[in-house]
Amino acid sequence: MDPEYSELFERLNKQLDNVEDVLKPLKDAESIFELAEGKSELEQAKLYITMSYAINSTLYSFYKLNGIDASERPVMQELQRVKNYISKIQQAEKNVNPKTEAVNTSNAAISSSSSNRPKVAKDAATRIIKHHT
């Protein structure tokens, strides 16, 4: 076997081992809701939206690998919606103090108007996960 391919296979094998380690809690949990239990709302939202993104991007990859035009499928709309939630979660993380998870009121734009704060649609994230599990 070509040494270049051998090195690539070795790297792939290590990466797959890392994926298995990361996914082990999902495998051991009865449900995603059990996995989310005890986490903050922000952490739960991150978990739900990450799972939704993983499921939808896998479906997108399946379509592409089978020569199906994924742009005509609802998965594209779902991926865009999930990406919007990801950006909202990232924005929310910037506005939350990680130790207390209290909103950072030193930012004048946030303290002056609560309508500027991003809101994570917990119910929507839960529906997405229920739909895909």
From Swiss-Prot:
InterPro entries: Exosome-assoc_fac/DNA_repair (IPR011082), Sas10/Utp3/C1D (IPR007146). Residues 102-116 have a biased composition (Low complexity). This is Exosome complex protein C1739.07. Component of the exosome multienzyme ribonuclease complex. Interacts with cut3. Belongs to the C1D family. Residues 96-133 are annotated as: Disordered. Its main location: cytoplasm. One of its GO terms (cellular component) is nucleolus. The keyword Cytoplasm applies. GO terms for molecular function: DNA binding; RNA binding. It is found in: Cytoplasm; Nucleus. It comes from the Eukaryota. One of its GO terms (biological process) is poly(A)-dependent snoRNA 3'-end processing. Required for exosome-dependent processing of pre-rRNA and small nucleolar RNA (snRNA) precursors. Involved in processing of 35S pre-rRNA at the A0, A1 and A2 sites.
